[in-house]
């Protein structure tokens, strides 16, 4: 399966880069992985609701421009559906069985995703009702994708 992760923002922390690189290496035996980093829009403090929407729309247009037309799109969204690791593994397996060879995960910037991006998503996935830094979510997502492949292949992985 081809998996792309479209993310707004760059990774600055070395410890996150190391973890991300480790899971990219581990995933290379299971899938073709592409991480597409997009520049985030500069957002000053104390934005109005309208200014937030403008920034999300600008980032959203960049995101939409990177989604392949045939991809099944999973947007990470706080209001999405929460899944266990086993349920994510089953979802990914079911998508492959149904002929989806391209899966695209989307991680928005600090303000979240635009309505247009959420509208394009085939599925909204929530890892928690809590908010996490989007850089950290990249590492957590990669770990969960790796765990899903291990589960689907009947391979041991710590719980």
From Swiss-Prot:
**Catalysed reactions, semicolon-separated:** pseudouridine(1915) in 23S rRNA + S-adenosyl-L-methionine = N(3)-methylpseudouridine(1915) in 23S rRNA + S-adenosyl-L-homocysteine + H(+)
EC top class, as a word: transferase
User: What is a single cellular component term in the Gene Ontology annotation?
Assistant: cytoplasm
Q: Where in the cell is it found?
A: Cytoplasm
The reply to whether rRNA processing figures as a keyword in the UniProt entry is yes
Q: What is its EC number?
A: 2.1.1.177
Q: Which GO molecular function entries does the Swiss-Prot or TrEMBL record give?
A: rRNA (pseudouridine-N3-)-methyltransferase activity
Keywords associated with the record: Cytoplasm, Methyltransferase, rRNA processing, S-adenosyl-L-methionine, Transferase
Q: Assign the protein's first listed, main location to one coarse class.
A: cytoplasm
For the ligand (S-adenosyl-L-methionine), the binding residues are 76, 108, 127-132
What NCBIfam families does the database record attribute to this sequence? PRK00103.1-3, tRNA_RlmH_YbeA
Instruction: Tell me, in a sentence or two, what this protein's role is.
Output: Specifically methylates the pseudouridine at position 1915 (m3Psi1915) in 23S rRNA.
Task: Note the subunit structure.
Answer: Homodimer.
The identity of this protein, by name, is: Ribosomal RNA large subunit methyltransferase H
Q: Which organism is it from?
A: Clostridioides difficile (strain 630)
Identify the coding gene.
rlmH
């Amino acid at each position: 399966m081809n998996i792309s992760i479209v993310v707004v923002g760059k990774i600055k922390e070395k410890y996150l880069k190391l973890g991300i690189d480790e899971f990219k290496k581990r995933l290379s035996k299971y899938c073709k992985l592409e991480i597409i980093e997009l520049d985030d829009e500069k957002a000053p403090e104390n934005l109005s609701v309208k200014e937030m929407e403008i920034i999300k729309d600008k980032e959203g247009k960049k995101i939409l421009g990177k989604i392949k037309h045939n991809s099944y799109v999973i947007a990470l969204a706080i209001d999405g559906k929460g899944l266990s690791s086993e349920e994510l593994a089953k979802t990914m397996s079911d998508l492959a069985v149904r002929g989806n060879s391209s899966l695209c995960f989307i991680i928005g910037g600090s303000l979240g995703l635009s309505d247009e991006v959420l509208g394009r998503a085939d599925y909204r996935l929530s890892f928690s009702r809590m908010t996490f830094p989007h850089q950290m979510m990249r590492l957590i997502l990669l770990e969960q994708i790796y765990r899903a492949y291990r589960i689907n292949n009947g391979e041991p992985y710590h719980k």
